């Protein structure tokens, strides 16, 4: 198994913060270079953690920057944080993405009737350990929810770290309710309400909020992997400004072994303090 590590540039909670991913000491793109499958035969997938559970900073893989570092999202030049919707604190799960997947905004999904959100596929890891930013976890797929976020299909794949003590008992979505009662309902609620404190309407779900099973989730992952394959080969209708630079896929047009030389060396700094207002709890009527 390859060993992944992170290269931190700047301090967390600042505009300069970037977390690059290295594989065996070589810089790679978490979007394009890390394989989707850690073990295809056993259906074990790689997941990149963007946001550890119970934290608020809205971190995400940058689609536009070379080698796609994890950065904090901004709005009007200000750092974005997810607010605390009672009784939750920050993100409800370890949150991240599947590499080598793309929710194609040029395509409508036949069942959700909405186009992709132009991101790698979102993943919620429900194990007991709080992850770290840029950690590459090996996970098994359990199911998927279809959020309709401002008119776009935004799949949320539910997974568990293969090393979690509960992993052997969780093999499909119904096992989650058996062993982690209330988790799926709380996850649905959190995604429904988490933007309300920012003055946005509650999010809607396809399938009446139902979490689809493992088989359905694997079909969604397959579709998004195919869409990424077209994207990286330069065959997509519109690549939407995504930086496709990679350091391992030598047969693709955007392969560049030299790209790593343009990336700053590690300069980790202690995290900057977060404004105390981010600690506030928001009470939302209709939430349970």
Curated annotation (Swiss-Prot):
Diphosphate binds at residue 80. PROSITE patterns: PPASE (PS00387). One of its GO terms (molecular function) is inorganic diphosphate phosphatase activity. Mg(2+) 2 binds at residue 122. Its EC number is 3.6.1.1. Mg(2+) 1 binds at residues 117, 122, 154. It is found in: Cytoplasm. The keyword Magnesium applies. It comes from the Eukaryota. SUPFAM superfamilies: Inorganic pyrophosphatase. Residues 258-271 have a biased composition (Low complexity). Its cofactor is Mg(2+). Keywords: Cytoplasm, Hydrolase, Magnesium, Metal-binding. It is an enzyme of class 3 (hydrolase). Has antigenic properties. Elicits a specific immune response in systemic candidiasis human patients undergoing malignant hematological disorders. Belongs to the PPase family. This is Inorganic pyrophosphatase. It comes from Candida albicans (strain SC5314 / ATCC MYA-2876). The lineage of its organism: Eukaryota, Fungi, Dikarya, Ascomycota, Saccharomycotina. The gene is IPP1.
